[in-house]
């Protein structure tokens, strides 16, 4: 039975179009027997912003403050959750040409040298291998494959850096460019999601 981790990152709650799309995928994959864990990074599972104290604590050590130990334990749990699943589904709405802060916080908690990647004499090597990722990215305008789409290249780089190179991307494009464009963008995204198997 396939295990799936879903990361929601929209700040828009019930108005979120990326959440609408990922919920469509969740329903489809649950019907196929997948075990799905949902982490709502902008809702009930919001993470702290990584500051200097936390960043230092994530390196470990014998003399951590209580806050550093708490954040290290949280990071370890997030990494364990990531490694325990077969497929990672990431929602990435475009906010001012970038990913939501809440998603970047998760990345900062799981991107750890010696834990999810390592440096070798031949360069960096990812330690989270044998996984698949699905990116669901929504945006108000039309940015796919253009110079204003920084989201997909960034997330593919991050995922590849930690060892996840099997990445599929589903786009919800031009969602704020009028009712017809919205309907078309959502419909095309759902068709792409329907083509994915768990």
Swiss-Prot record:
EC number assigned by the record: 1.6.5.-, 1.7.1.17
InterPro entries xref list: Flavodoxin_fold (IPR003680), Flavoprotein-like_sf (IPR029039), FMN-dep_NADH:Q_OxRdtase_AzoR1 (IPR050104), NADH:quinone_OxRdtase_FMN_depd (IPR023048)
Residues that bind FMN: 10, 16-18, 94-97, 138-141
Catalytic activity field: 2 a quinone + NADH + H(+) = 2 a 1,4-benzosemiquinone + NAD(+); N,N-dimethyl-1,4-phenylenediamine + anthranilate + 2 NAD(+) = 2-(4-dimethylaminophenyl)diazenylbenzoate + 2 NADH + 2 H(+)
Keywords: Flavoprotein, FMN, NAD, Oxidoreductase
Record-linked Gene3D superfamilies: 3.40.50.360
Co-factor binding comment: Binds 1 FMN per subunit.
A molecular function GO annotation: oxidoreductase activity, acting on NAD(P)H as acceptor
Superkingdom field: Bacteria
Pfam families: Flavodoxin_2 (PF02525)
Residues in the signal sequence: none
Essential cofactor(s): FMN
Protein family according to the UniProt entry: Belongs to the azoreductase type 1 family.
Assembly and binders: Homodimer.
Function: Quinone reductase that provides resistance to thiol-specific stress caused by electrophilic quinones. Also exhibits azoreductase activity. Catalyzes the reductive cleavage of the azo bond in aromatic azo compounds to the corresponding amines.
Name of the featured protein: FMN-dependent NADH:quinone oxidoreductase
Species assigned in the record: Shewanella sp. (strain ANA-3)
The organism's taxonomic lineage, starting at the top: Bacteria, Pseudomonadati, Pseudomonadota, Gammaproteobacteria, Alteromonadales
């Amino acid at each position: 039975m396939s295990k799936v981790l879903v990361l929601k990152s929209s700040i828009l709650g019930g108005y979120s179009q990326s959440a609408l799309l990922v919920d469509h995928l969740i329903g489809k994959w649950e019907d196929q027997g997948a075990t799905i864990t949902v982490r709502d990074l902008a809702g009930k599972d919001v993470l702290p912003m990584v500051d200097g104290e936390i960043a230092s604590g994530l390196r470990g050590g014998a003399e951590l403050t209580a806050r550093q130990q708490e954040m290290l334990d949280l990071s370890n749990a997030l990494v364990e959750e990531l490694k325990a699943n077969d497929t990672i589904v990431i929602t990435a709405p475009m906010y001012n040409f970038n990913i939501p802060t809440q998603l970047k916080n998760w990345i900062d908690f799981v991107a750890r040298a010696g834990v999810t990647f390592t440096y070798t004499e031949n360069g960096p090597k990812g330690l989270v291998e044998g996984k698949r990722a699905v990116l669901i990215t929504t945006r108000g305008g039309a940015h796919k494959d253009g110079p204003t789409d920084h989201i997909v290249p960034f997330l593919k780089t991050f995922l590849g850096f930690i060892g996840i190179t099997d990445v599929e991307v589903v786009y919800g494009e031009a969602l704020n460019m009028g009712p017809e464009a919205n309907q078309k963008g959502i419909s095309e995204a759902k068709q792409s999601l329907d083509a994915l198997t768990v």
